[in-house]
Amino acid sequence: MYKRQLDGAQPQWGVASADVLVEGVTEGSTAGLTAIFADVDSISKVGPVGAGRDLFLQVALPLNAVPVSIDKNIYASNLLNTLGYQDLDGYHIGKAAFAFDQGRQDAGYREENCWYTTGELIRTGLTNYGASAEGDNTPLFRFGTRPEVNPENRNGMNLTVTFSKTDSEQLNYNTGTGLYEKLNADGSPMTDADNGQQVGFTNVFVLYASSGIKDDGYTRQYDMTGGTGLYLQGGAWEQINWTKEDATGPFTLTDADGAPLTVAPGKSFIAIWGGYYGQGLTLTAADGSEQTLPEKPVLLESGVSDEAAAAAEEELSAAQRIIDAQAAVDQAKADLADALDELQEAQTACDADSENADLLAVRDAVQAKIDELNQTIADNQAILDAAAPEETPPPEEEQPAESEAETPAE
């Protein structure tokens, strides 16, 4: 189940009831999110439903899951078509499997953030395709009993996953519930719009994956064949390794020594993390000490180096500063014309009643406003002048050479 993540999509339905949440950047700077449910009948309401992406398909397909989305990009479409895998896409099946929350729109939410589905609607949609939700689920992990973590060994209490400079999210361990409680990028608790419950997980994974850019020059490409990573549970963390054969192959997780990783039963959060420019990870222990984490993954050949990304970011920022400065100058000049008219009116009133303190205060306030506008113009004009290309001086005219006839005789 792909969920919309952009501004205006929160709170989302079904995030607390999902068995697994998977998050990672597929394009732009905001991480995409998908929810995985073990039982379709456990889905009371989930959404707002977003567009499908192939990164999340590679997590869901090995589980024999039904991908549910409204539209999808070309890479997700190509993958499903190649495999002959039936999904449920609202772009094609419409209201047979999806519904619109009018009350949410009436509350001010955009239309695209009001579409949802339910377990019953999913079953109806699959029936329209002659498909069924019945079938065996493939376990995502090797579940089993893990040793209890002693308080003095809680070295993985607070995790910050920075997906971009504008999308940094936290998972904090609650010793009372034994869950990692998730916060939104703005620091607010991530809650379920269906029941108001805060989203929490028994297990948290950060899977390192080398990344680059696909051939459209925009969509993120990840090497999903394997890498290192982090596993957090019970307030402690350990380094792990993971492998995956292909798009339909399951994850194989091992501990640092290569032994199969035993995962505690419960809900799980998985972050796909490329470690490219603008991304970061911070993990602290119960005493606040920052942990030393594995080195970030190397870039794919199509990836952009940190140096090149920083240079491009600075170039973009410089261009934006010029745009902002010009807009500020234009606006200040327009406001200045009005302010000068106000000053003239205020001065005329003062001339007629020079002892009136209220009129003098109005005049002084207008003058202060004019001074502020002039300063705004000066400050932003300085930015424009500094960015303007230097004028090339005109070439010097060549002096004609003296002829031998004009050379005086000795």
Question: Where are the language model's segments positioned?
Answer:
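Low-complexity/repetitive intrinsically disordered segments
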Residues: 1-2, 410
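A surface/extracellular/periplasmic glyco- and lipid-processing/surface-interacting theme
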Residues: 4-20, 27-306
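Hydrophobic, Leu/Ile/Phe/Ala-enriched alpha-helical segments that form helix-helix packing faces
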Residues: 25, 80, 404-406
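Extended amphipathic alpha-helical heptad-repeat regions
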Residues: 304-410
